[in-house]
Amino acid sequence: VEYILGANDMYDVVKFKTAADKKTVALQPASRPGAVSETVYVLPYSTQKAASGTHGTISKIDTISNNSFYYTLNMKTGEKTVSCPVMNAEGEVVALIQKNSDKESTSSYAIGIGYAKSLSISALSANDYTLNTIGIKKGLPEDESQALVYLYVSSSNLSKEEYLNLLNEFIQQYPKNSEGYSRRALCYMGYGDDAHYALAEKDLQTMVEVNENKGDAYYNLSKLLYNYVLGLQGAKPYGDWTMERALKEINTALENDKQGLYYQLQGDIYFAMQKYPEAFASYDAVNRSPLASAASFYAAAKTKELIE
């Protein structure tokens, strides 16, 4: 098993991805749901000594959700057939046998294959109790925007190493998404040593390369560097990770797009460098943009006081 793709504890179903060679022939899910009175066959595990199949008919079908069904079967099954596939005459999988609470019952129950197929990892699966108790790592959501939210939610629940592994998987699955590189760079920076800073620098460059919005890319790069230098509190920075570098990157962002948000960061950087006339000019540009606010007017006024 490589990773979990979904689970439901009510119906005791888990969907997961496994590694298989090309010679392995997979069973195909049924193209249509089963029908009442249709003859179906239980395919036993190949590890059983007596691998004789069981057959019976469908006596009842309950709809549990859109295109998902729960079957009552006229056949007796035991513990050794739990989760075994229920096949139709075409050799397709209709359902999976469920555990029967009554060992002597001549009826069996099966969850439709459509329900099992519909299981998935969503943006909020990071906090899913059922998935977390399985003990096998979860896959990422197949939708890219959902996968991003999944990253946000997971960042506060995982250890640094676990989160880094998740970021690696995200980048492997979505190599053109710049958010993955910026988040991994930030994670590397959290280790606080030169080896990880070097990895972070590489990711920051890749973040800029893959982001089609260059203004946004250089803004994010500048913001990361600005926050990093502020956090040093006077300590020696790594390489050229300085306010001067942060200023260079935000200036490049402004060359691409003169957004008020970019001027705001430019002003903050100038202010941190104690270049108050330049900071005032930047804040003044913010105040002439749609981003103008009480905070930006206060920043401009405060900076002007320092000039005088």
What residue ranges belong to the model's regions?
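Residue-level recognition of tetratricopeptide repeat
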Residues: L186-G190, K223, L230, D268, ...
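Conserved active-site neighborhood of the chymotrypsin/trypsin-like protease fold
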Residues: V1-V40, Q48-A51, N67
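C-terminal cap/linker of serine protease catalytic domains
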Residues: L96-E162, L166
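Structural motif corresponding to the intra-repeat A-B loop/turn of tetratricopeptide repeats
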Residues: N157, Y191-D194, Y228, D240, ...
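Active-site region of chymotrypsin-like
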Residues: A19-V25, S52-I121
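Short coil turns that delineate tetratricopeptide repeat
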Residues: P175, E212, N256-K258, L291
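Start-of-helix register in tetratricopeptide repeats
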Residues: E179, D216, Q259-L261, S293-A295
